[in-house]
Amino acid sequence: MAEIYQNHVIDPTYFYDCIEEFSFNYTIYVVEKKEIDASGNVKRTYSKNAIRGSLQSQGVELRQSKDGNTKEMRYNFYCKSLYRIDIGDIIEYKNRYLRVESVKDFDEYGVRECSLLMVQLTKYRDLADYIKYLQGAKLV
């Protein structure tokens, strides 16, 4: 006789109302494609989209090194499972650019979670050029 498993099934939209209660609109830059140029540098192509979710601060950490001290700002982002977020995507918040470092698949309640780290645009020239283009400061 086949064994019967007692898995519970919950509607994946169960927490959508709760998420919506604490959500705001954010700009997200999604990595469309990656290429390697002749010099061996990775060149990314971004597209600008909107995402709705809840951004929670995880605090600031001081990183000390011989090259100089820096502060790292970390955030967690929660949104509906409908959104597809991947490592490398960047969310804009108060003129800060937060790079997705890790993504957790949505849970049985339909919540998707990812961890973010604030980055400097000087380290992401492709994105910096794209943002200047969107603002009209740079022509293609």
Please give the residue ranges for each predicted region:
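Short, conserved turn/kink motifs that form compact alpha/beta structural patches or helix kinks used as
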Residues: A2-V9, F22-T27, V31-V140
